[in-house]
Amino acid sequence: MIYENNNFTLSQDRELPIVGFFVISPKKHIEKLNELSEQERNEMFSIINTVIKIEKDNNICKDFNVVFEEKDKRHFHVRIMPRHERMSKICNNITQNIGLIFDYAKKNFRTENIYNKINEAVKITREQFRS
C-alpha cells in the first residue's frame, strides 16, 4: 500500500513489474465511475494528478495513460500506466494493447534491476504523499 484515505487506496501491482505503474481503487465496491459521488471523483482525480506530478518531478516517467477499468460485476479501478520509451517497441497503442504490455512485462521485466526501480518509485511516491 502506497497511500490510503477514507475512500481510496493507491498501490503498485507486483504481478505487473512496470516502473511507475499504479492502481487506484475505491474502498467501496462500485462497478462504474458514475457510481462515485462528485466529491469522490474529485478526490480520485486529485490522487491521479498527484501521482503523475510525483513521477514527472522525480524522473520516473514523463508520459502516461490513465485507464478507467469498468467491467460488469467487477470492481472499478484506475490504472496509471506509464509510457516508457521501451514500451513503444512492444506496441504502438498502449491502451488498445494493454494486455500485450502486461504479458510482455510479466515475461521480461521480472528482474532484480526492475524490481529495485519499482521499489524506489514506490518509496518516492509514498514519501511524497505523506509530506
List the model feature ranges, each with a label.
Residues 1-131:
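HIT superfamily nucleotide-processing domains
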